[in-house]
């Protein structure tokens, strides 16, 4: 699963996920893309689960790019532990997603195959997504 190799600090504050994606919002590598329409957090497990669904559907054809990376640690206290005594340990990593962010890209397959693969992947994700095709000249 995806997670950072090293971090300057193990724990991070919660923060707020606001605004729209200004970078990483266009199809840059492949011919087709899966774009986020809503905002939220995608865990490393969800990103990997969607990738597997797409890979299995397109079989040996095509190429997939993952345009997001889970770099934010989410900490959690153990079960039945009293409040206080500091912040819990990092449990998993998430990618903060804003509307307009390109999640995955695909190339080397037909549009019908790509559309179906992205539909299967979108079912694994907790945010609304759209299928997009690369614009001519970009």
From Swiss-Prot:
GO terms for cellular component: cytosolic large ribosomal subunit. Keywords: Ribonucleoprotein, Ribosomal protein, RNA-binding, rRNA-binding, tRNA-binding. Pfam families: Ribosomal_L16 (PF00252). GO terms for molecular function: rRNA binding; structural constituent of ribosome; tRNA binding. Gene3D superfamilies: Ribosomal protein L10e/L16. Residues 1-24 are annotated as: Disordered. Residues 1-13 have a biased composition (Basic residues). SUPFAM superfamilies: Ribosomal protein L16p/L10e. One of its GO terms (biological process) is translation. Part of the 50S ribosomal subunit. PANTHER family: 50S/60S RIBOSOMAL PROTEIN L16 (PTHR12220), LARGE RIBOSOMAL SUBUNIT PROTEIN UL16M (PTHR12220:SF13). Binds 23S rRNA and is also seen to make contacts with the A and possibly P site tRNAs. Belongs to the universal ribosomal protein uL16 family. This is Large ribosomal subunit protein uL16. The gene is rplP.
């Amino acid at each position: 699963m995806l997670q950072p190799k090293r971090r300057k600090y193990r724990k991070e504050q919660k923060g707020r996920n606001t605004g729209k994606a200004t970078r990483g919002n266009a199809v840059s590598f492949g011919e087709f893309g899966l774009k986020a329409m809503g905002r939220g957090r995608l865990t490393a497990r969800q990103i990997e689960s969607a990738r597997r669904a797409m890979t299995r559907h397109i079989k040996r054809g095509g190429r997939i790019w993952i345009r997001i990376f889970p770099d934010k640690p989410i900490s959690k206290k153990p079960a039945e532990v009293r409040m206080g005594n500091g912040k819990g340990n990092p449990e998993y990593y998430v990618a903060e997603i804003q509307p307009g962010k390109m999640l995955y890209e695909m190339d080397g397959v037909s549009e019908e195959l790509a559309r179906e693969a992205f539909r299967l992947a979108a079912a694994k994700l907790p945010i609304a997504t759209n299928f997009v095709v690369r614009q001519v000249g970009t």
